[in-house]
Design a protein with these regions (language model features):
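Transmembrane beta-barrel strand/turn architecture of Gram-negative outer membrane proteins
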Residues: 1-43, 104-142, 196, 200-202, ...
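Extracytoplasmic gating/loop element in the C-terminal half of outer-membrane beta-barrel translocons
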Residues: 127-222
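Membrane-embedded beta-strand positions of outer-membrane beta-barrel proteins
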Residues: 122, 217-219, 257
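C-terminal beta-signal and terminal closure region of outer-membrane beta-barrel proteins
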Residues: 20-53, 154-155, 159-163, 178-180, ...
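Outer-envelope beta-barrel architecture signal
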Residues: 105-107, 116-118, 189, 211-215, ...
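Conserved small-residue
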Residues: 1-99
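Extracytoplasmic loops and strand-loop junctions of Gram-negative outer membrane beta-barrel proteins
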Residues: 24, 88-96, 148-151, 176-184, ...
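Short sequence motifs at beta-strands and strand-loop junctions characteristic
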Residues: 99-104, 183-192, 247-251
Length: 261
């Protein structure tokens, strides 16, 4: 298991420390006893079934209908549980999300077998727990610009005949439908098949007749498979839960002959 906790805060952050003894550092919240990578951002509540616009949490002290009235395209209200919401992140409130990029457990499993001249070795890696911010997926779910590619999940978007969905309606010239929020946080758990090697060593008595000391044929496969919470997502990009334009480990298959005289 992996444990991570802050034991003290830097002195130069004293002016930023709030009532609960922590401070914001980009998309993270730093506090004593918390993880170095606890996410801090907007909380996505879903889609307004009446309009198709997104809903983001706003703190009660920041909720001001008098200030909201007259703002173009802005919707606001209160959920049945008392939570206040707005449709634009410019008026929403960032908050501690209770999710960390730090995994609960990570490791690997490997094994090797030999029988009747055959040898097989397998190496795997895994992670359980933690969250990753899937920025690729977010960019494919509505950038607010023309000529952009879309993820197939956009077909689940709100329409007048599909009002029970978590995907807002499509809009141009707005980032609110894909703004940074916990909507794009997804579990970073994964299982990867890192290597499989299969070989066969010919019997010595066969090789003696050919005046060869040893002969082995083998096939090697690297990075053959990755299972994650969303197809195409590689949570291994960074330990901080961020994603970038990086290549995943390439899948390769090769073979060879080991010959000894």
């Amino acid at each position: 298991a992996y444990k991570n906790a802050l034991t003290r805060l830097p002195l130069d952050k004293k002016t930023l420390i709030e009532k609960d003894g922590g401070y914001q550092a980009g998309s993270y919240w730093r506090s004593v006893g918390g993880s170095v990578y606890d996410f801090y951002d907007y909380h996505y509540l879903g889609v307004n079934p009446n309009s198709g616009l997104p809903m983001y949490t706003v703190d009660e002290e920041d909720y001001s209908p008098a200030d909201f009235d007259g703002v173009k395209g802005l919707e606001y209200g209160q959920m049945e549980d008392g939570t206040y919401w707005v449709s634009q992140t410019s008026y929403a409130s960032r908050q501690k999300l209770g999710k960390s990029a730090i995994p609960e457990v990570y490791g690997g499993i490997s094994t090797s077998l030999e029988a009747y001249g055959f040898d097989l070795s397998v190496q795997t890696a895994f992670q359980i727990g933690g969250y990753v911010y899937d920025s690729y997926y977010a960019s494919l779910m509505g950038s607010g610009e023309y000529g952009q590619n879309w993820h197939k999940d956009i077909f689940k978007r709100w329409t007048p005949t599909n009002t029970t969905t978590s995907v807002p309606k499509v809009q141009n010239n707005t980032q609110n439908i894909s703004e940074a929020s916990d909507r794009w946080l997804i579990t970073a758990s994964y299982f990867s098949l890192r290597n499989i090697t299969l070989g066969y060593t010919f019997p010595k008595k066969w090789m003696e007749k050919a005046k060869i000391r040893s002969l082995r044929l083998y096939v090697v496969g690297d990075n053959l498979a990755l299972a994650s919470a969303r197809k195409g997502l590689d949570p291994r990009q960074s330990f901080s839960g961020s994603t970038g334009y990086n290549y995943s480990a390439l899948c390769t298959v090769s073979g060879g002959i080991s010959l000894g005289f």
